[in-house]
């Protein structure tokens, strides 16, 4: 048997749902999708869900992952085994851990390949910081997986599809974290998964102010702006949602223009599926040039304005 009888899907990030649904179609005969609102439910059915389960009634001071109890109950009530697919976001991984505990299921994070053999999930993901690929065969009846961005192509919506809609009511967990306050995070809308062209900056750009040079190039060619992990996590120059690498975004754009990025393996596993890689780096021995189809050795601060002017003509 090379498919599960059913798969359960949830995404806290709407842009990740289409790819999870495409993966679900390949892995199971019946697709169940948990959603947070009616609009997401309509989208899920158009993407191929047979059953939509609307999570309802959570108090404002509780976290989404506190739905884990009723989600696990629903999953158990509809089969003695099954596959759960979640995005490898921070919330996705928190929810995966809670579901794994409640379902007595193995949890595998950051999956880059998923297949079914003899009714059991076989998962591949990067190990040793991206230096190797590990393979796991999950033996528990339920399997909970968080999926790396780009593992599956995005499913295409079909308005003619139909499905059944159900409601799952909130039940307060015995122990939970209560949210006492919220602070709005300054963040731009990011949809890098769908970008055809990506300009990505590393610490070689020199300063936060110099990122404006890359932004101008993005505007000139219609690209999205991304970055390496150190730019987001260490320097705090850009949002976490924009960094490319093994523990975050795995992109497949037509063009990936790496600016001031050294090209360490942990970054390149997130960009190496690009159709064309163009690198700008002043270090001629930078590892990025081993991956690049085209490259310029030089100072990005001087090259970017000239490149923008040429491409904007």
Swiss-Prot record:
Pfam families, per database record: ETF, ETF_alpha
Superkingdom per UniProt: Bacteria
InterPro entries per record: DHS-like_NAD/FAD-binding_dom, ETF_a/b_N, ETF_a/FixB, ETF_asu_C, ETF_asu_C_CS, FixB, Rossmann-like_a/b/a_fold
Keyword Electron transport: yes
Entry binding sites for FAD: 255-283
Listed transmembrane segments: none
GO MF term set: electron transfer activity; flavin adenine dinucleotide binding
UniProt entry keywords in alphabetical sequence: Electron transport, FAD, Flavoprotein, Transport
Key word Transferase present: no
A GO biological process held by the record: carnitine metabolic process
Pathway: Amine and polyamine metabolism; carnitine metabolism
Function: Required for anaerobic carnitine reduction. May bring reductant to CaiA.
Subunit organization: Heterodimer of FixA and FixB.
Homology family: Belongs to the ETF alpha-subunit/FixB family.
Protein name, entry field: Protein FixB
Gene from which this protein is expressed: fixB
């Amino acid at each position: 048997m090379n498919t599960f009888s059913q798969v359960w899907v949830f995404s806290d990030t709407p842009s990740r749902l289409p790819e999870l649904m495409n993966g679900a179609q390949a892995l199971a005969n019946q697709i169940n999708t948990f959603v947070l609102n009616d609009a997401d439910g309509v989208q899920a059915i158009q993407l191929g869900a047979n059953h939509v389960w609307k999570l309802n009634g959570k108090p404002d001071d509780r976290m989404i992952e506190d739905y884990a109890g009723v989600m696990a109950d629903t999953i158990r009530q509809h089969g003695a085994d099954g596959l759960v697919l979640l995005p490898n976001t921070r919330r996705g991984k928190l929810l995966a851990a809670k579901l794994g505990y409640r379902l007595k299921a193995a949890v595998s994070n950051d999956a880059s390949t998923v297949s079914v053999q003899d009714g059991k999930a076989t998962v591949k993901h990067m190990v040793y910081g991206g230096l190797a690929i590990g393979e796991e065969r999950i033996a528990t009846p339920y399997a909970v997986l968080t999926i790396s961005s780009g593992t599956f192509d995005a499913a295409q919506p079909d308005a003619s599809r139909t499905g059944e809609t159900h409601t799952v009511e909130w039940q307060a967990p015995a122990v939970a974290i209560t949210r006492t306050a919220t602070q709005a995070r300054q963040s731009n809308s990011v949809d890098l998964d769908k970008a055809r062209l990506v300009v990505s900056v590393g610490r070689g750009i020199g300063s936060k102010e110099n990122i404006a040079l890359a932004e101008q190039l993005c505007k000139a060619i219609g690209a999205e702006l991304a970055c390496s992990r150190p730019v987001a996590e260490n320097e705090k120059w850009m949002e976490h949602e924009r960094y490319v690498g093994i523990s975050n975004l795995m992109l497949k754009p037509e063009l990936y223009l790496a600016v001031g990025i050294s090209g360490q393996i942990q970054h390149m596993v997130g960009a190496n599926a690009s159709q064309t890689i163009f690198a700008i780096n002043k270090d001629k021995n930078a590892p990025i040039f081993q991956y690049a189809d085209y490259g310029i050795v030089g100072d990005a601060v001087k090259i970017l304005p000239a490149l923008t002017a040429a491409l904007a003509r």
